[in-house]
Amino acid sequence: MPYVDRQNRICGFLDIEENENSGKFLRRYFILDTQANCLLWYMDNPQNLAIGAGAVGSLQLTYISKVSIATPKQKPKTPFCFVINALSQRYFLQANDQKDLKDWVEALNQASKITVPKAGNLPLTTEVLKSLATPLALEKKPQVAYKTEIIGGVVVHTPINQNGGDGQEVGEPGSHAILRRSQSYIPTTGCRGPTGPPLIKSGYCVKQGNVRKSWKRRFFALDDFTICYFKCEQDREPLRTIFLKDVLKTHECLVKSGDLLMRDNLFEIITSSRTFYVQADSPEDMHSWIKEIGAAVQALKCHPREMSFSRSISLTRPGSSSLSGGPNSILCRGRAPGEERKTLCKAPSLASSWQPWTPVPQAGEKLLPTEETAEDSLFTPRLGESSTSAVLPSSRIRHRSEPQHPKEKPFVFNLDDENIRTSDV
């Protein structure tokens, strides 16, 4: 239902059909400002929006000719609906209940009435104009960005120097703050680095603070293990991280009191140490957050080891020698442990540069020149043993890098034998 704020404006939530005859109503926050002679509607309460965020729609009160309850013929399937006739356009709005509908219709009709001021009210009008000029002068005061921290249980505001690193002069006007904030909402690929776990869901929501109970818009990101919220989408470091293992329950907040009464699409994340109150932009978004968080918590409880293994693969840097270092890791899973250990211990760079030990021949000793073929193995039989004979289990096989033992006869075969094979020479 509508209420009057500190600036004597009528405020509240309504559903508006922005495109006539579309049948789609969107939730908006309306402000009826009789002093500014206009009706404004925002995406949310301006206190929750970013600095400099303007209204998504406006309507001058002088253009309103009539405000009445919509007939069943106009909107048969929309209860508590009323219509604003302004110039040649009609605005259909939907209230929460019958009392809300009646209050809004009376307030809009009262504000759109054309009144002729009396002669005795001219000085009063001048005073009103002066009082209106005073807040406008105060609003022109430059706003300073600050960072809120809790040090020793005390809230400390630290001013932030926004000129640092931008190449701007100190004497430039302070309008760059709004420009920087508008640039910060340019969509990007995400707030996480390329090595982080993939995001399940992300988006902006309004969160209640723990100390001052203030509501601020934050960028939430949900992955397989945590719920993080950032000041904006481009931030790398989160303001806080909620581990899914600590989440006890996530559901829609139905029991409201105090400041929570005016909060729609509100759900709570209950942990062992704190309850987080989060407001989504729409009921669909709220139910989507509740569903995704609940599914992630359930998946973490059912398969904690598989989730941790998948995260270790995603966090491994490319080119590393771990199991997830390359495409060969999939082939190594089916090997024996000994073979896998050999593959990991022997680096490719060392294998290409490894050279066998070459002995220095003794004086007066001749080495038999041999031709290496593709069939030569790494280990060769000792001198004096035939290549065709079977190798005894107790005999030691000589490595090609081991020097040959000196023998009396330099040649094993008789070169004058006619039955000798050419391959034995």
From Swiss-Prot:
Residues 374-410 are annotated as: Disordered. PROSITE patterns: PH_DOMAIN (PS50003). One of its GO terms (molecular function) is PDZ domain binding. Keywords: Cell membrane, Cytoplasm, Isopeptide bond, Lipid-binding, Membrane, Nucleus, Phosphoprotein, Repeat, Ubl conjugation. One of its GO terms (biological process) is positive regulation of cell-matrix adhesion. GO terms for cellular component: cytoplasm; nucleus; plasma membrane; protein-containing complex. Binds MPDZ and PTPN13. It is a peripheral membrane protein. Residues 400-410 have a biased composition (Basic and acidic residues). This is Pleckstrin homology domain-containing family A member 2. Binds specifically to phosphatidylinositol 3,4-diphosphate (PtdIns3,4P2), but not to other phosphoinositides. May recruit other proteins to the plasma membrane. Gene3D superfamilies: Pleckstrin-homology domain (PH domain)/Phosphotyrosine-binding domain (PTB). Its main location: cytoplasm. It is found in: Cytoplasm; Cell membrane; Nucleus. It holds the Pfam family PH. There is a cross-link at residue 141 (Glycyl lysine isopeptide (Lys-Gly) (interchain with G-Cter in SUMO2)). Residues 7-113, 198-298 form the PH domain.
